[in-house]
Amino acid sequence: MVHLSADEKSAINAVWSKVNIENDGHDALTRLLVVFPWTQRYFSSFGNLSNVAAISGNAKVRAHGKKVLSAVDESIHHLDDIKNFLSVLSTKHAEELHVDPENFKRLADVLVIVLAGKLGAAFTPQVQAAWEKFSAGLVAALSHGYF
């Protein structure tokens, strides 16, 4: 797993303190579903996802985006044990939901875009490097149930 220094943990927590779990989760999931439309197949129960307006205005997209970022929030509280913390969620996505684990990386990538847009100049290269390292650990932990 990924080892984070004290400075990296501090940067991750500083970024996360500025996140609005509901709004930023909605933005990240909306971006995922628009930019990577094939991911919509995992959300067939969400109803109309036919265009940007439908996705953006979908209450189930908003609720699931909040759920996703709530899991990220909890993971940040378990930085030293993300793999074990996310083991049940990883197994669920692998065995029950059959989500392609590449989509965890895609979601991590769109979350970086949302965070960069939100933080602007405060999302420095050093902050991004710490966040990317955390994201890699998160993706690895979520993918663990597949292998």
Curated annotation (Swiss-Prot):
Annotated binding of heme b, by residue: 64, 93
Family indicated by similarity: Belongs to the globin family.
InterPro entries in alphabetical order: Globin (IPR000971), Globin-like_sf (IPR009050), Globin/Proto (IPR012292), Hemoglobin_b (IPR002337), Hemoglobin_oxygen_transport (IPR050056)
CDD domains for this protein: Hb-beta-like
Segments traversing the membrane: none
Gene Ontology annotations of biological process type: hydrogen peroxide catabolic process
Tissue expression per record: Red blood cells.
Keyword annotations from UniProtKB, A to Z: Heme, Iron, Metal-binding, Oxygen transport, Transport
Name assigned to this protein: Hemoglobin larval subunit beta-1
GO CC terms in record: blood microparticle; haptoglobin-hemoglobin complex; hemoglobin complex
Domain named Globin: residues: 3-147
PANTHER family: HEMOGLOBIN FAMILY MEMBER, HEMOGLOBIN SUBUNIT EPSILON
GO molecular-function term, one example from the UniProt record: heme binding
Role of this protein: This is a larval (tadpole) beta-globin.
Subunit-structure text: Heterotetramer of two alpha chains and two beta chains.
Gene3D superfamilies hit by this protein: Globins
